[in-house]
Amino acid sequence: MPAALEIRGLTKSFPGFTLGPIDLTVPEGAIYGFVGPNGAGKTTTIDLIFGMGAKNAGEIKVLGLDHLRDEVAMKQQVGYVSPDLNYSPWGKVGRVIQFVKGFYPTWDDAYCDQLLRVLNVGKHERIMSLSFGARIKLSLILALSWRPTLLILDEPTVGLDAISKQEVFGELLKAVGDGERSVLISSHGLADLERFADHVGMIKRGKMIFEGSTADMIERHRIVDFVLGSDQGADRGHSIAKRDGVFVQRQEANRWRVLLDLKTAPLEWLRESGATQITEAPVTLEELFVAIGRE
């Protein structure tokens, strides 16, 4: 499958923090959830995609274009939404629409009007008077109205209530419905992403922990409860806890609860390690995020 965004071996060093090496692929036509704790490196990665800051190493291809050598051509096809964007100096919503429209020959007036109506933002409203959530909606309207091939959103649901989130994700689903557009979302709204994102990547302390289809990520992980007999000894428990793909949730005496990555730590291995009374339960994306994030 062609990639809308392909990152290979990306690194960036700061005092006290190193990003990468990062490998990340957003398939064409996908809604990709890019998740991780605060300070994990999500925004830094997005900044580097847009050439804000110099990477130490690695390659970034956006729609087959080098993100630096082909910067102008790239930015003509990539939309961006962030809570940090400030359109207040343009006064009213209609005025900033006219300003941004002038940069994009592909601007669709009818689509813009539709988005304004669906997301409940008025052209005559003063931007300074908009709520924080409404300003996020305005950023999304300005990014979607010229129908970019790739849309990159940094925390797009911050400040939105449940209904507004549904409206925003509904419009994103429509935007990628033809399979020719792709979306990368950096977000903490994991419950939303589980419903809408078909691919997910998790970053922690500057490193990618996993990446793949959302369904596969959820399917390959389980919350597992088990018992280790008192004759197993502390070394056996320590060995289980240190296995790749095992994330300890709780231990009380000889009773354990762990998150298992069945690809690297299958249930059969757990049985062979002496575990008994094994029960398993499916995991949500949020449970997966919390479990891996606390390790």
Where are these regions (language model features)?
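C-terminal coupling/interaction segments
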Residues: N254-E295
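A structural detector for beta-sheet-dominated domains
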Residues: R8, P27, V227-G229, D261, ...
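ABC transporter nucleotide-binding domains
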Residues: P2-I7, K12-I185, L190-K204, I209-F210
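Alpha-helix N-cap/helix-start and coil->helix boundary motif
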Residues: T11, G94, L190, D231-G233, ...
